[in-house]
C-alpha cells in the first residue's frame, strides 16, 4: 500500500509522520522531520477570510515551524553555520505527511519564507511561511489595459501570468464573460481579487499541491467524507447564524459605459533632444482609459510621435525631434464611466454588497439571490476539533455525524488549522452546504 487513505487517518492506532523540505538554494536542501530538527508545526488554510458576510477577503495559507537550533545551525547571523547567507525571505518549503504503513508521502502545501527568527544562544528557530498567493496579494498591481467582454478564465490566466504563475485551476462551471475587466483602480491585489471573487461567486485559494484554485461557491460538489465520533470528532462549537446580523440584502450594480472623448494626459513643457526620446511611463489623469483617440505635440520645432503604448492607467511613447527643444504633450481618449444602481430590499440591517465586477442586472440578480438565500437559511457555522485527515481539502463537502452532540451537519470546509506536536490534530470550520444553494 503506497497511499495514505481516509481509513488510515481515521485509525486510532495510526502513527503519522510529517516532513518538510527546505530549499535553501537550487543545490542545498534540508529534510526536516520529527527525528531531525522538527519541534512542532502548524498549517492554517482558508478559502476566504471568514466574516459576517458570505463573501470575504482572499487570503493565503500559513505555515509556522519551530526548529531545534542545534549549535546555532538555523541562526541567520551565525557566520560559522552551514546555512549562513542562505537563510532569507522567499526560501521554498514543501510540506508532506503520511501514515506509518505507507511509503509515499502526501503533499501538504508549498510555502515561501517571510520571517525567520533565531535568537543568539537560543535553542529553537521560528519560521513563518505562506503559499504563493501571499506573493500575489503583496505584489504590485498589474497595469493592464481594460479587457472588453473577456472570458473569466482567460482573464485569470493573464493576471496570474503577470506573477509568473502559469498553473492555475479554474472551476469549469464559472462560465462568465466580463463586460469590462480591469485592475487599475485598485490599491492592492487583495482588494482586486476579493472584489473580483464577489462577481465570480467564487473562492480563490491554494490546494495541497501548491496550485492556485478558483472554485465556484455554488457549483455542485460530491460528498467527500463523513466524520463521526468513532473516527475523527473530538469536540465542536456552533456560531450564531448570519440571519441574526442582517434582515435584508442590498446589491449595487455598477454598469460600465464608454465616455465621450476627453483629455487623458496633459504635459505643458517636456524637454526633448535630437532623435528618439522615450517618455517613460506617465500616469493618466483620467482612469481607467478605454482608448487613445489622438496625441498632440507642440513646440518651436516639429516633434512627432513615433509609437505609443497605453494601459488603463499608464501611457508611454517615443517622440522624435530634429533638434533640442521643449514640447507639450496632450493625449485624448475615452474612459470607462460607471453608472450605479441598487437592487434588493433595504431593511433596518441590510447586508450591502458592492463590487466593481457586478456590471449588469443579470449578475446583480444572481448575487442578490445567492446572498438572500444565504441570509434566510438560518444555518450555523460549525467549528469542529478533529484528529485530522490531511486528505481533506478546502472546498470539500463533508458530513459531521455525532450522536454525542446530537447533530448531523453537511458542510463545506472553508478553514482548516492543522497542528503537529509529535502527533496531528485539526480544527475545521464549516459553512452549511444547504446555504450555498448548489446547482
Language-model-derived ranges and their functions:
Residues 61, 109, 123-125, 210, ...:
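Envelope-exposed proteins and targeting segments
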Residues 68, 132, 148-171, 357-361:
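Glycine-rich, acidic and aromatic/proline-enriched surface loops and short helix-turn segments
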Residues 86-88, 106, 145-153, 185-190, ...:
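Solvent-exposed, acidic/flexible segments
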Amino acid at each position: 500500500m503506497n497511499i495514505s487513505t481516509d481509513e488510515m487517518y481515521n485509525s486510532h492506532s495510526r502513527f503519522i509522520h510529517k516532513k518538510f523540505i527546505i530549499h535553501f538554494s537550487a543545490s542545498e536542501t534540508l529534510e526536516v522531520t520529527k527525528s531531525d530538527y522538527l519541534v512542532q508545526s502548524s498549517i492554517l488554510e482558508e478559502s476566504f477570510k471568514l466574516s459576517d458576510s458570505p463573501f470575504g477577503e482572499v487570503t493565503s495559507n500559513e505555515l509556522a515551524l519551530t526548529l531545534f537550533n542545534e549549535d546555532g545551525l538555523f541562526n541567520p547571523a551565525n557566520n560559522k553555520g552551514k546555512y549562513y547567507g542562505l537563510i532569507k525571505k522567499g526560501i521554498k518549503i514543501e510540506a508532506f505527511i503520511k501514515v506509518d504503513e505507507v511509503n509515499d508521502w502526501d503533499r501538504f502545501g508549498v510555502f515561501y519564507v517571510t520571517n525567520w527568527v533565531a535568537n543568539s544562544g537560543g535553542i529553537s528557530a521560528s519560521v513563518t511561511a505562506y503559499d504563493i498567493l501571499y506573493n500575489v496579494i503583496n505584489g504590485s498591481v498589474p497595469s493592464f489595459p481594460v479587457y472588453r467582454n473577456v472570458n473569466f478564465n482567460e482573464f485569470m490566466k493573464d493576471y496570474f501570468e503577470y506573477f509568473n504563475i502559469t498553473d492555475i485551476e479554474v472551476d469549469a462551471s464559472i462560465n462568465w464573460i466580463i463586460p469590462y475587466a480591469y485592475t487599475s483602480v485598485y490599491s492592492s491585489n487583495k482588494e482586486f481579487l476579493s472584489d473580483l471573487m464577489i462577481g465570480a461567486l467564487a473562492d480563490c485559494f491554494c490546494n495541497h499541491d501548491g496550485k492556485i484554485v478558483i472554485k465556484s461557491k455554488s457549483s455542485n460538489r460530491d460528498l467527500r467524507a463523513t466524520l463521526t465520533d468513532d473516527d475523527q470528532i473530538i469536540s465542536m462549537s456552533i456560531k450564531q447564524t448570519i440571519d441574526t446580523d442582517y434582515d435584508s440584502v442590498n446589491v449595487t450594480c455598477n454598469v460600465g459605459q464608454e465616455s465621450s472623448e476627453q483629455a487623458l494626459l496633459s504635459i505643458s513643457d517636456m524637454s526633448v533632444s535630437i532623435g528618439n526620446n522615450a517618455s517613460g511611463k506617465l500616469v493618466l489623469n483620467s482612469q481607467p482609459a478605454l482608448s487613445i483617440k489622438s496625441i498632440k505635440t507642440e513646440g518651436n520645432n516639429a516633434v512627432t510621435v513615433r509609437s505609443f503604448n497605453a494601459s488603463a492607467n499608464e501611457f508611454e511613447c517615443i517622440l522624435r525631434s530634429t533638434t533640442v527643444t521643449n514640447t507639450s504633450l496632450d493625449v485624448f481618449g475615452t474612459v470607462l464611466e460607471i453608472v450605479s444602481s441598487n437592487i434588493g430590499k433595504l431593511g433596518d440591517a441590510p447586508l450591502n454588497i458592492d463590487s466593481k465586477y457586478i456590471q449588469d442586472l443579470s449578475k446583480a440578480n444572481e448575487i442578490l439571490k445567492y446572498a438572500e438565500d444565504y441570509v434566510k437559511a438560518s444555518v450555523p457555522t460549525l467549528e469542529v476539533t478533529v484528529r485530522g485527515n490531511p486528505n481533506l481539502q478546502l472546498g470539500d463537502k463533508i458530513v459531521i455525524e455525532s450522536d454525542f452532540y446530537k447533530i448531523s451537519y453537511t458542510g463545506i470546509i472553508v478553514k482548516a488549522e492543522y497542528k503537529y506536536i509529535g502527533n496531528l490534530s485539526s480544527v475545521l470550520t464549516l459553512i452549511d452546504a444547504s446555504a450555498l444553494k448548489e446547482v
